[in-house]
Regions:
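Conserved ATP-binding/catalytic motifs of P-loop helicase motor domains
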Residues: 1-224
Length: 224
């Protein structure tokens, strides 16, 4: 099924490799928590286009969120999915946070409660409503901190939506408490690792990019 949907979705003769096919199938499947890891250039965006179509064919929706509004906007444009910054989605679902000397303090409003930030009554999510079976895809998930991931998990539990953490845990660390992607990965019922780099025409450059990604394991990557 994934191969057929990919043929209908992708243009210019593009196809998915085995890892992309598995990842698209996992995101378009029924696992509530999915993790897809891989360095830049492994075709995560192309894979997400196909996953979105898989979900749509089932009457389900993909919502892409990212740590920054710009990253979310780019992901939305490239995949055709609804997109938002992760914090905008959390805010829409009632979460509020303030910085304190000991870290961020998170609270959650319930419908009918007054929002202390605006003085208005919070009426529930209005911009990013989620239904059972929808999939929230967290792009650049390696940058998500534990507090934020915990809030998203609560929303998924309440709404019945699934989560897909997509990104490279070795690329960039979050500003807050790190480890969210690793924790989500350990709890995921579907984990896919993308390893084929498509960004470079010369395979040697792709291999080098993978070595640079883990300099601790290959200290000669940069030198050679």
């Amino acid at each position: 099924v994934v191969t057929e949907v990919a043929a209908d979705t992708l243009t210019n003769g593009r196809t998915l490799d085995a890892g992309q096919t598995e990842a698209a199938g996992a995101i378009g499947g029924t696992d509530r928590l999915v993790t897809v890891t891989g360095p830049a250039g492994t075709g995560k965006t192309t894979m997400l286009r196909v996953a979105r179509r898989l979900l749509e064919n089932q009457g389900r929706r993909m919502v892409i969120v990212a740590p920054t509004k710009k990253a979310a906007s780019v992901a939305g444009q490239e995949t055709g999915a609804t997109a938002s910054s992760l914090h905008a989605l959390l805010h829409d679902h009632g979460f509020r946070w303030t910085d304190t000397p000991t870290g961020q303090l998170w609270t959650r409003l319930v419908p009918g409660q007054e929002d202390p930030q605006t003085g208005r009554i919070y009426e529930g999510p209005t911009r990013y409503e989620l239904d059972r079976g929808d999939r929230v895809v967290v792009d650049e998930a390696g940058m998500v901190d534990l507090h934020t991931a915990n809030a998203l998990a609560a929303i998924a539990l309440d709404s019945g939506a699934g989560i897909a953490m997509v990104g490279d845990h070795l690329q960039a660390l979050p500003v807050g408490h790190s480890g969210a992607m690793s924790l989500m990965r350990s709890r995921s019922s579907a984990v896919v690792e993308l390893s084929a780099v498509h960004r470079f025409k010369d395979p040697a450059w792709g291999a080098l990019s993978l070595r640079i990604r883990e300099p601790g394991r290959d200290a000669m990557a940069v030198a050679h």
